[in-house]
Amino acid sequence: MLLLYEYDIFWAFLIISSLIPILAFFLSGVLAPISKGPEKFSSYESGIEPIGDAWLQFRIRYYMFALVFVVFDVETVFLYPWSMSFDVLGVSVFIEAFIFVLILIVGLVYAWRKGALEWS
């Protein structure tokens, strides 16, 4: 019976953290002015009226560079906590992290060989 009371704080935070965004979305929908005019359908570019067609097609190279960046950014997210607790975790976790980095290096070499990192 005592163990059920230990989760009261968890459930309170879960309910409150769920209600706050729902309430914010509800209030913004109720209080926001509804106006449909030509300004709503024009694109906004730093306060300057757009000239010509606002729809541009980006080259696939931008996406490839972004994808490679995201992969190595996620690598940093995983390796930083590991490096901070390296002395506590031991050798087995070092081997796992080494295999993780090795897989990422193989992926980088593969992307390099396929020409994904070539700009022109």
Swiss-Prot record:
EC number: 7.1.1.-
The reaction(s) this protein catalyses: a plastoquinone + NADH + (n+1) H(+)(in) = a plastoquinol + NAD(+) + n H(+)(out); a plastoquinone + NADPH + (n+1) H(+)(in) = a plastoquinol + NADP(+) + n H(+)(out)
Species in which this protein is naturally found: Trachelium caeruleum
InterPro entries assigned: NAD(P)H_OxRDtase_bac/plastid (IPR023043), NADH_UbQ/plastoQ_OxRdtase_su3 (IPR000440), NDAH_ubi_oxred_su3_sf (IPR038430)
Enzyme kind, highest EC tier: translocase
Keywords (A to Z) from UniProt: Chloroplast, Membrane, NAD, NADP, Plastid, Plastoquinone, Quinone, Thylakoid, Translocase, Transmembrane, Transmembrane helix, Transport
Membrane topology qualifier: Multi-pass membrane protein
Name of the protein described by the UniProt record: NAD(P)H-quinone oxidoreductase subunit 3, chloroplastic
UniProt record similarity statement: Belongs to the complex I subunit 3 family.
GO molecular function, one term: quinone binding
Annotated function: NDH shuttles electrons from NAD(P)H:plastoquinone, via FMN and iron-sulfur (Fe-S) centers, to quinones in the photosynthetic chain and possibly in a chloroplast respiratory chain. The immediate electron acceptor for the enzyme in this species is believed to be plastoquinone. Couples the redox reaction to proton translocation, and thus conserves the redox energy in a proton gradient.
Principal location: plastid
